[in-house]
Amino acid sequence: MLPLNVTITQITEESPLVRTFFFDHRFEDMDPGQFVMVWVRGVDEVPMGLSRNNSITVQKVGEATSKLFELKEGDSFGLRGPFGKGFTLPSRGEKVLLIAGGVGAAPLSPYAEAASAAGAEVHTILGARSAGDLLFEWRFEALGDIYASTDDGSKGVKGFVTDVLKGLDVAAYDRIAVCGPEIMMASVFRLLEERKVLEKAEFSLHRYFKCGIGVCGACCIDLSGLRVCKDGPVFSGIQLLGSELGKYSRDASGRRIKI
């Protein structure tokens, strides 16, 4: 699949290191949690979750994202997708808990809106380093209860999302969706396993992608052969039992590295 050339229509600075890029194309058939391959000309092609059907939200962490931060309204980049398996939408009347850490709030925000539109009750645990880093807080607040945690205590609970989670009756929720740094997700995974509600949970994983369509195998996890780009990026908690979640990732050569 050749990249679709899109033009930037608006750039919103969410924080000093996070920006949302709106573009002149809508992926009307996207499933919340799916990703696109973003082609930054002359640099690289990298996977990113969609924060709306016409936007990506980018954290400046490397060469490709740094180059994106140099772009202005009217500039263009390439997109392939959407790819992969998204989050499972709830049924009317179900109670959903979202657990987002940092920029992991980006793919969870359209899921929250879709879940609410489907008639579900949506609650969110939103974690970040400080109050100014709580991404899309207003979008989640518009849909239901929100619980914040910050590393520095500038808003909500001082600590991590797990500190908030420990105080909730997780058994009362029908579905739990998690996205954020893998160390955070691994901590949430262990807590949900202890509470015996892992079968209700889905986790969005990030791995090094090359093709994005399940051919090259660069993003396979463990010995299971599960491909993050094709079988995921969203996996059920049961699928991840005994996996390398929170322990290992892989570099561009496919070598397993400690997280």
Curated annotation (Swiss-Prot):
Q: Where does [2Fe-2S] cluster bind?
A: C211, C216, C219, C229
The record's annotation in InterPro entries points to:
Cyt_c3_hydrogenase_gsu (IPR012165), Dihydroorotate_DH_ele_sf (IPR037117), Dihydroorotate_DH_Fe-S-bd (IPR019480), Dihydroorotate_DHASE_ETsu (IPR023455), FAD-bd_FR_type (IPR017927), FNR_nucleotide-bd (IPR039261), OxRdtase_FAD/NAD-bd (IPR001433), PyrK_electron_transfer (IPR050353)
Q: Which Gene3D superfamilies match?
A: Dihydroorotate dehydrogenase, electron transfer subunit, Nucleotide-binding domain of ferredoxin-NADP reductase (FNR) module, Translation factors
Cysteines paired by S-S bonds:
none
Q: Which GO terms describe its biological process?
A: 'de novo' UMP biosynthetic process
Q: What note does UniProt attach to the cofactor annotation?
A: Binds 1 [2Fe-2S] cluster per subunit.
Record GO terms (molecular function): 2 iron, 2 sulfur cluster binding; electron transfer activity; flavin adenine dinucleotide binding; metal ion binding; oxidoreductase activity
Is the Electron transport keyword given for this protein? yes
Q: In which pathway does it act?
A: Pyrimidine metabolism; UMP biosynthesis via de novo pathway; orotate from (S)-dihydroorotate (NAD(+) route): step 1/1
What protein name is recorded for this chain? Probable dihydroorotate dehydrogenase B (NAD(+)), electron transfer subunit
Q: Which gene encodes it?
A: pyrK
